[in-house]
Regions:
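Glycine-rich phosphate/ribose-binding loops and adjacent secondary-structure elements
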Residues: 25, 32-34, 42-212
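A residue-identity detector for tryptophan
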Residues: 2, 92, 134, 193, ...
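Active-site entrance/lid segments in N-terminal catalytic domains of soluble metabolic enzymes
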Residues: 1-109, 315, 325-437
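Extended charged low-complexity segments that act as oligomerization/scaffolding linkers
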Residues: 33, 110, 159-317, 321-334, ...
């Protein structure tokens, strides 16, 4: 995605140049090498993006950012120190430990703005970090930060795209109180973790398709994730637990497509439309049209060479001419797949009887991977199951078609306890944080 956003495609700089209100970039999932980071900061600022932040999650990564800050001085950059209580992908590092171990080094750089996050879900907790009083618990003097990261607390804001049902679940989720006592004798003093593969307070700690630790709401989706992780670690169980896997997948927003070899060609097309429409991405419609073209090529009477489609016009034909000929355009597919399914059944009635042949069964995963945007279903039960299911899973929590129990939502286990309102304006939420400071 980096190449898509900032590399060869440069989507973000182009959007910024055209007037999009994007002023900053956060570099996460690792810290670039020194030379690369220096060049990156230079290029981003030249593109009109003045605020460049790095998000370290370990002591070594924090020190890497300090070296970067020294190399680009006096240019100001931000360091977002995130502890292991943050939502979504997380480390097992305590925020307080990270800050205490590196505070002097960070503060020695006048051009480094220190922001802390991960488990800061209430105004009172944020105030402790802004004032520096968080350090008193360790017998240390005030160690104030310049800002705090607010993530989970904004998930139910009026402006948040989170679906109403998921917002309700977030309010109902107790989470882990910030003053809770941990039973983990190895946990740092201030850490409140959900053990890997377990659930506490309505929160679960699982693995994403990247095989990285992830905090998420405990629901059918999280339960399915645990099963898939188990099978990933024990691939010999894939066949024996196939029925259980399919049942678990079908309770989530990303169900199993179905046993393609047992479907007819018409059922194949109908199932695709059922799971993918309304199209949340235009490439879903592209792949649906390619599927119909594959089916037509399979069932058409012509043995070889070209044939005249009974479904679609050639590219470039106007909508008026297409309608006059009784054929469909790509715009018709974008609007609604139903007419195409009806036309397929009428033009090729044999599609309701013919079973999908093995060559087309094998081709289907190729179609699914045709574009970068993953499809909203699992096309095949194989050893890549966790990736098929886990990719591109977060948008469903913003789509009212899907129940809160079926989607992956990723608040922090501490901060979720501080969510008490639904559809409160974000200005009011941030205002409460500001007032506490």
């Amino acid at each position: 995605l980096w190449n898509l956003q900032f590399g060869s495609s440069r989507i973000v700089p182009k959007k910024r140049a055209s007037g999009a209100p994007i002023d900053g970039v956060v570099v996460s999932a690792g810290i670039p090498e020194l030379d690369e980071a220096v060049e990156l900061i230079k290029n981003l600022q030249a593109d009109g993006l003045p605020y460049v932040s790095f998000k370290p999650g370990t002591v070594d990564q924090i020190r890497q950012v300090v070296r970067i800050a020294k190399a680009v001085a006096p240019t100001t950059i931000m360091i977002q120190v995130e502890g292991g209580e943050a939502g979504g992908h997380h480390s097992w590092e305590a925020l307080d430990d990270l800050l205490a171990a590196t505070y002097a080094e960070v503060r020695a750089c006048d051009n480094l703005v220190l922001v802390a996050g991960g488990g800061i879900g209430t105004p009172e907790r944020a105030a402790d970090y802004i004032s520096g009083q968080w350090a008193h618990a360790y017998g240390l003097p005030d160690m104030p930060v310049d800002g705090v990261l607010i993530g989970t607390a904004a998930m139910t804001a009026k402006e948040a795209h989170t679906s109403p049902e998921v917002k309700q679940l977030l309010v109902k989720t107790p989470g882990i109180p910030a003053d809770a006592k941990s039973d983990d004798v190895f946990a740092p003093q201030a850490a409140h973790w959900v053990p890997s593969g377990k659930s506490v307070g309505g929160m679960s700690s699982g693995l994403s398709h990247l095989h990285a630790d992830i905090y998420e709401l405990e629901n059918d989706s999280a339960e399915c994730g645990r099963l898939l992780v188990r099978v990933m670690k024990h691939p010999e169980e894939l066949d024996s637990r196939r029925k259980e896997i399919i049942e678990a997948l079908n309770k989530t927003a990303k169900p199993y497509f179905g046993d393609l070899a047992s479907m007819t060609y018409l059922e194949w097309a109908q199932r695709f439309a059922e799971l993918a429409f309304p199209w949340v991405d235009p490439t879903y419609a592209d792949r649906f049209q390619h599927l119909l073209q594959r089916i037509e090529a399979r069932v058409n009477d012509t043995d070889s060479g070209e044939f005249t489609s009974k479904l679609f016009t050639a590219d470039g034909v106007s909508a008026e001419k297409a309608a006059a000929a009784g054929l469909l355009t790509h715009d018709d597919i974008l609007a609604d797949p139903a007419p195409a399914l009806e036309k397929l059944a009428l033009a090729y009635p044999q599609t309701a009887e013919l079973k999908v042949v093995p060559a087309d069964v094998a081709w289907f995963p190729v179609l699914v991977r045709e574009y970068p945007k993953p499809m909203p279903f699992v096309p095949v039960i194989d050893n890549d199951l966790l990736r098929w299911w886990g990719q591109d899973q977060l948008w469903q929590s913003e789509d009212q078609r899907y129940s809160a129990d079926s989607v992956r939502a990723i608040p922090g286990p501490i901060s979720v306890a501080g969510i008490t309102t639904i559809d409160e304006p974000i200005a009011d939420i941030l205002g409460r944080f500001e007032a506490a400071m």
